[in-house]
């Protein structure tokens, strides 16, 4: 049994303008100690899928189908009280903007103590000691005294470290990191990603890393799901996605990334067009209107199938393996990275 398994998840929001198909049949799994990267443009459904895992999208106007199995137990069928126990205890989440995630009027220590006592029957002193221990664990110096600081007295990187500490108060089995480095400068981004990796190795938890930046997952993920317009269009190991991509959307993402092995004067390629409205997604393949390789069959919805000879490498495209090989030769090094020497 997988630690977490998502089966054909659909999340549709009923609005005045129509039904928004935010997640349209996503399936994936996460094992203990693994890091899964979920990559895609803003609005592709990656955050909605993971907020649904935590039960944060439930409302009278939300239609949720499929199964979310945590060690075999279906969270979609769980009651609100049961989900409250799951949040923080089994699965924790770091949100992308720590400034808005922390309450500006309460000290960091008060917020951490509250998180500890929400799931543990401990005294306020014990909870405060645990809070100081966690701040020290995430690399904040003089942790005991910094508990009495307000969020605005922390730098952006320190606020994100405090959010990571809050997520770890109950030693969760799974940590969901939703764009954890978006609001940080490049140097601090690297520190936060390294911290998450270090904590994962120390605590043995699984990590789901949500991002629009391929560079973020390049050094951290074991597996990658590429999402587009509510659907997973390609899934595989880190090496499969970076060195042997199979879906035209993945080709476009990789081609638009600046690389140190290319001349600085070379123009980056771009994906033409705009992401579709999830109120009225295109018929068949959702990437069809932007794909330079579209043909008639693309008006039918392609399945997420294994690539021939590689069972764990899946892609949602009607192009045959031979056609993909030909297109990659024609487009040259704009698609994928050069495989490392053996």
Put a short name on every predicted segment.
Residues 149-154, 158:
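Conserved ABC ATPase signature
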Residues 73-74, 125-145, 251, 255:
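Conserved ABC ATPase "signature" region
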């Amino acid at each position: 049994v997988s630690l977490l398994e998502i089966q054909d998840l659909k999340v549709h929001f009923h609005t005045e303008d129509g039904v928004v198909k935010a997640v349209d049949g996503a399936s994936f799994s996460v094992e203990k100690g693994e890091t899964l990267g979920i990559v895609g443009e803003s609005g592709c459904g990656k955050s909605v899928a993971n907020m649904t895992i935590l039960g944060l999208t439930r409302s009278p106007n939300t239609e949720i189908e499929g199964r979310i199995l945590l060690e075999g137990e279906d969270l979609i069928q769980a009651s609100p009280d049961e989900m409250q126990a799951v949040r923080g205890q089994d699965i924790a989440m770091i949100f992308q903007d720590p400034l808005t995630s922390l309450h500006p009027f309460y000290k960091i220590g008060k917020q951490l103590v509250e998180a500890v006592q929400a799931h543990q029957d401990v005294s306020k002193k014990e909870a405060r000691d645990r809070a100081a221990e966690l701040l020290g664990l995430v690399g904040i110096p003089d942790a005991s005294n910094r508990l009495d600081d307000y969020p605005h007295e922390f730098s952006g990187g320190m606020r994100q470290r405090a959010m990571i500490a809050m997520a770890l108060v109950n030693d969760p089995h799974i940590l969901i990191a939703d764009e954890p480095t978006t609001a940080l400068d490049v140097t601090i981004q690297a520190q936060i990603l390294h911290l998450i990796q270090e904590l994962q190795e120390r605590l043995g938890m699984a990590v789901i890393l949500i991002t629009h930046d391929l560079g973020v997952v390049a050094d951290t993920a074991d597996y990658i799901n590429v999402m587009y317009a509510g659907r997973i269009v390609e899934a595989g190991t880190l090496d499969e996605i970076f060195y042997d991509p199979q879906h035209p959307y993945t080709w476009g993402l990789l081609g638009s990334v600046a690389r140190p092995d290319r001349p600085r004067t070379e123009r980056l390629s771009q994906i033409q067009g705009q992401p579709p409205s999830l109120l009225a997604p295109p018929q068949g393949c959702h990437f069809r209107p932007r794909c330079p390789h579209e043909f008639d069959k693309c008006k039918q919805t392609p399945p997420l199938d294994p690539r021939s000879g590689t069972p764990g490498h899946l892609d949602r495209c009607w192009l045959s393996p031979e056609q993909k090989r030909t297109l990659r030769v024609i487009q040259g090094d704009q698609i994928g990275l050069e495989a490392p020497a053996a």
